[in-house]
UniProtKB/Swiss-Prot annotation:
Other notes: CTPSs have evolved a hybrid strategy for distinguishing between UTP and CTP. The overlapping regions of the product feedback inhibitory and substrate sites recognize a common feature in both compounds, the triphosphate moiety. To differentiate isosteric substrate and product pyrimidine rings, an additional pocket far from the expected kinase/ligase catalytic site, specifically recognizes the cytosine and ribose portions of the product inhibitor.
Subunit structure: Homotetramer.
Binding residues for UTP: 13, 186-191, 222
Name of the protein in question: CTP synthase
Organism: Methylobacterium sp. (strain 4-46)
Length: 542
């Protein structure tokens, strides 16, 4: 029997519903249950693919090519289970599907309404394909009271009535703010949030209370009384040093035990959390530290690089070091000398991005790393700019540039118009739509057996996730390789470059894919593990 747990949020946004959902899933997994995580997003975009990273944060790409919410990254990292396009849906996607059906005549002239058509579509999404799971955890984006979230709250309310008794539960994540002048945590915002939730027909079974200090017994009793939950169901979600402490914290508070009790399951054994304790210990007690520069264009919102940050942390865990991140806006290097910003750092990473802004700054960062023998990791756009830099500085192609920025006589990077997905040829046009038209999802790459990157992977055939519209031009391969920039990995047909590396450099690698999307705390991605290892070596030379 599949059981459903719906996770909602109240009082303020950005409380960490995604992390809470992922942590609960990890706890249930450690008890031996099969868990699925899903996300309902109330915004009207069909997917986050065309949304600004500075507004929405990272776009997390799945193996099957879906552009999804960054919370799916938390789901994968905490559970180790790859997400799919079937694990995330938006209001925009639902409306698009419904309107397409209406235009086709599928509704036979019926009046299309939010209830029942939109709510039914939400319910169908939630209920579909769960036969293999013991628990399905469904996170509802946004905050209770948001207008755009009402159809989702109504849908999960209806599911509470339609599912068999004992098959559905609700967790409400809320905030207990501390007021210094009063010297106490305040429960009133949570009471009002729960009242709002109850007004639309949902009674939470568990309160997950974010706070920065212990909840006094009297405040727990007050919350239980006025929010109509058991006192044992008032769970303290206190701030922790690392997100990898969250499962440990929730486990100590008994969140998983309380969830099992809701479904009448006797929790015979405690979850096996030894590996989480190991991760926590390594994060808290590193044996050294390194400093990495991230030269990007969305540095104002760190969530734009969420998976990247975590992958670097995983590399640090693997090498038992703390990874300090120095965030540098790429445009600065277009006006100033990079040296004062990059001197003394142990590695330089240029992540993915779109557009011309900051591109020349990234090129200058790549040149500095190459000339100063500092470990360099270029991801997607970061690889492309490293190749442009090598074309200009090493191969003497002064006009080398990307057609993404406009016409150029030397298109070292150009628009990717066709490629193979398995045995099928996919095509795109320059004038086509932006949404969902990139090279998206997992693709296979073939690595040169004697290359550094093949040694790092321990294999010559790999599969990584992509999200890009432009690609390095293979017509320049011979001239670049003659100057020491090796095309060490390509698509299986040899037509598309996937990785480059600079020969004679301690560690200079560019990849067209996004390896950060597949890194896990218990399985650090080999490239990030190796990059941080190279940074550790560099730190001993400074």
């Amino acid at each position: 029997m599949t059981r459903f747990v719906f996770i909602t949020g109240g009082v303020v946004s950005s409380l960490g519903k995604g992390l809470a959902s992922a942590a609960l899933a990890a706890l249930l997994q450690e008890r031996g249950y099969k868990v699925r995580l899903r996300k309902l997003d109330p915004y009207l975009n069909v997917d986050p693919g065309t949304m600004s990273p500075t507004q929405h944060g990272e776009v997390f790409v799945t193996d099957d090519g879906a552009e999804t919410d960054l919370d799916l990254g938390h789901y994968e990292r905490f559970t180790g289970v790859p997400a799919t396009r079937a694990d995330n849906i938006t209001t925009g996607r639902i409306y698009l599907d419904i309107i397409t059906k209406e235009r086709r005549g599928d509704y036979l002239g019926a009046t299309i309404q939010v209830i029942p058509h939109v709510t039914n579509a939400i319910k169908e999404f939630v209920l579909d394909g769960n036969e293999a799971y013991d628990f399905v955890l469904v996170e509802i984006g946004g905050t209770v009271g948001d207008i755009e979230g009402l159809p989702f709250f109504e849908a999960i309310r209806q599911l509470g009535q339609e599912l068999p008794r004992g098959q559905c539960a609700y967790i409400h994540l809320t905030l207990l703010p501390y007021i210094p002048s009063a010297g106490e945590l305040k429960t009133k915002p949570t009471q009002h949030s729960v009242a709002e939730l109850r007004s639309i027909g949902i009674q939470p079974d568990i309160l997950l209370c974010r706070c920065d200090r212990p909840i006094p017994r009297e405040e727990r009793r007050k919350l239980a009384q006025f929010c109509n939950v058991r006192e044992s169901a008032v769970i303290e979600a206190r701030d922790v040093e690392s997100i990898y402490d969250v499962p440990l914290s929730y486990g100590e508070e008994g969140l998983d035990r309380e969830v099992l009790a809701l479904f009448g399951i006797e929790a015979a054994n405690a979850p096996k959390l030894a590996r989480w304790r190991t991760i926590s210990e390594r994060v808290k007690n590193p044996e050294g530290e390194v400093s990495i520069a991230i030269v990007g264009k969305y540095t104002g919102l760190k969530d734009a690089y969420k998976s990247l940050i975590e992958a670097l942390t995983h590399g640090g865990i693997a090498n038992r070091v703390k990874v300090n991140l120095e965030w540098i806006e790429a445009e600065i290097f277009e006006r100033e000398d990079p040296a004062p910003f990059l001197e003394g750092l142990n590695g330089i990473l240029v992540p993915g991005g779109f557009g011309q802004r900051g591109a020349e700054g990234k090129i200058r960062a790549a040149r500095y790393a190459r000339e100063k023998k500092i470990p360099y990791f270029g991801i997607c756009f970061g690889m492309q700019m490293a190749v442009v830099e090598a074309a200009r500085s090493l191969a003497g192609i002064e006009a080398a540039n990307s057609t993404e920025f406009g016409p150029t006589p030397e298109p070292v990077v150009g628009l990717l118009t066709e490629w193979m997905r398995g045995n099928e040829l996919e095509k795109r046009a320059a004038e086509g739509d932006l949404g969902g038209t990139m090279r998206l999802g997992a693709y296979t790459a073939a690595l040169a057996p004697d290359s550094r990157i093949a040694r790092i992977y321990g294999d010559t055939v790999i599969q990584e996730r992509h999200r890009h519209r432009y690609e390095v031009n293979m017509a320049y391969r011979e001239r670049l390789e003659a100057k020491g920039m090796r095309f060490s990995g390509t698509s299986p047909d040899g037509l598309l470059p996937e990785t480059v590396e600079v020969e004679g450099h301690p560690w200079f690698i560019g990849v067209q894919f996004h390896p950060e999307l597949k890194s896990r705390p218990f399985e650090p991605h080999p490239l990030f593990k190796s990059f941080i290892e190279a940074a550790v070596v560099q730190s001993r030379l400074v």
